[in-house]
UniProtKB/Swiss-Prot annotation:
GO cellular component terms listed in the entry, alphabetical order: cytoplasm
InterPro entries documented for this protein: SurE, SurE-like_Pase/nucleotidase, SurE-like_sf
Record function comment: Nucleotidase that shows phosphatase activity on nucleoside 5'-monophosphates.
Protein name from the UniProt record: 5'-nucleotidase SurE
One MF term in the entry's GO annotations: 5'-nucleotidase activity
Superkingdom, taxonomy of origin: Bacteria
Residues that coordinate or bind a divalent metal cation: D8, D9, S39, N96
Main location (coarse class): cytoplasm
Length: 260
């Protein structure tokens, strides 16, 4: 079986290297990842310039290791449609340096890599380790490979992917595993305005995270309690509970139509 691996930290990031080594115990691995960091790129795809896939040297057993001058979604799309000779049994995106929790999933290139696999009908998994700089990816990689084996055997529902967040703790201090829902967080942005040497304004985007929903059943809450969080996500973003109410108060826009 073949496992496609990508990320948003770039092909030289330590997380993807640890992940590919561990997944090689489960199946054959193909690495197709951005040539440079593309964090917070969301689900952007490249439509206005050529994409190039360049072979790179890789430590460990892989079918291929290619760096792409595009986004994580580009990498998965390109791999599935042009680069691979067979369909992968699983798409894994990660291991990201830093958690992807709550509304982070809407910005995350890591999650979008897995999302692109899901759009194309492949079981898919996004993996993030809640740490910064110099962290040890070995436990996260080992846990991901065990989870990958289960997913390959059991599959996932159509249109569903998993978002995995692992605490940056020694394995003995992790409190267990939680199946969670998305929490809610926002970034209280501080925009810094500066001037370049020519006197033209430019801006830096920064800010602090504010967790608005961190109940114990959320991914944010679970990680805060030292537990591994697995959140099933699906492609359908429809708010079904609001459809009838919306139809009722917008019916005047097209009288007599109703909610067909």
């Amino acid at each position: 079986m073949l496992i496609l691996v990508t990320n948003d930290d770039g092909i030289n990031a330590p997380g993807i290297k640890a992940l590919s080594r561990s997944l090689a115990r489960v199946g054959r691995v193909a690495v197709v990842a951005p040539e440079k960091e593309r964090s917070a790129i969301g689900h952007g795809i490249t439509m206005h310039k050529p994409l190039r896939a360049t072979e790179v040297t890789w430590e460990g057993p892989v079918e291929m290791a290619l760096a792409v001058n595009g986004t994580p979604a580009d990498c998965v799309k390109l791999a599935l449609d042009a680069l691979l000779d067979e369909e992968p049994s699983l798409v894994v995106s990660g291991i990201n340096m830093g958690a992807n929790l709550g509304t982070d999933v809407l910005y995350s290139g890591t999650v979008s890599g897995a999302l692109e696999g899901c759009i194309n009908g492949r079981p898919s998994l996004a993996v993030s380790l809640a740490g910064e700089g110099g962290v040890d990816f070995s436990f996260a990689a080992d846990f991901t490979s065990r989870l990958a084996g289960v997913i390959i055997k059991r599959g996932l529902p159509a249109g569903t992917l998993l978002n995995l967040n692992i605490p940056c703790l020694p394995p003995g201090e992790i409190k267990g595993l939680a199946i969670t829902r998305l929490g809610r967080r926002r970034y209280c942005n501080t925009i810094t305005r500066r001037l370049d040497p020519r006197g033209r304004a430019y801006y830096w985007l920064a800010g602090e995270v504010e967790d608005l929903d961190q109940e114990p059943d959320t991914d944010i809450g679970a990680l805060g309690q030292g537990r591994i969080s697995i959140t099933p996500l699906h492609l359908d973003l429809t708010n079904y509970s609001y459809q009838q109410e919306l139809a009722a108060y917008l019916s005047f826009l097209w009288p007599g139509q109703g909610n067909r």
